């Protein structure tokens, strides 16, 4: 049987598909088992994020088709971190699992899927990365409204590594977190962090002009979001960082 393919997609701010980062570093640890196709032609841009995701989706679809059509005996695996997890999640949900999807013919060849800090995480579906952070609680899910569903019913294995406190991957169904979902929509559509009416800051201010009875939950959500972003400069204490080694072990079990 042919060596399986591993397709990896980096997170925001990591446009070099071969550079350091969770997906690429994980792939380098399993090159004795997998053929590796990192996804380039994808800007991994913070602003605007959704067009960046769409470019990643298009490139991942293209590479899967090229590699799997060329070798009908090869199985494959997917791995994505943060924005890259959105790319993988979009392709998995809408193009592989979907019976009308462009890649549905390859569903039976998909063996493993890995997410780290996944904004599309299915509610209650989380795995530990055996590191310093608590795994996300069973009543949490990803921040995007378009989430993965019913992953347990398919023939491929999934590891969705999610930390408690990772705002992208671990929110609850309550008033405060409804506003965090709104903040997630802002991040997807904003063209810059500050400056102009289409910036994150301008849209957060607009969000803050909701009726007073919504104010407490909204304020808590914004404070939570700003605290989360501020911690991004604090190294391993930021809950959106992950340990890759459980994923390496998972990929090696084929």
Swiss-Prot record:
GO BP, sorted A to Z: defense response to bacterium; killing of cells of another organism
EC code(s) of this entry: 3.1.-.-
Enzyme class, spelled out: hydrolase
GO molecular function, one term: hydrolase activity
Entries under InterPro entries matching the protein: AB_hydrolase_fold, Lysin_B_C_ter
Protein origin, superkingdom: Viruses
Job description of the protein: Endolysin that degrades the junction between mycolic acid and peptidoglycans in the host cell wall and participates with the holin protein in the sequential events which lead to the programmed host cell lysis releasing the mature viral particles. Once the holin has permeabilized the host cell membrane, the endolysin can reach the periplasm and break down the mycolic acid-rich outer membrane. Cleaves the ester linkage joining the mycolic acid-rich outer membrane to arabinogalactan, releasing free mycolic acids.
Descriptive protein name: Endolysin B
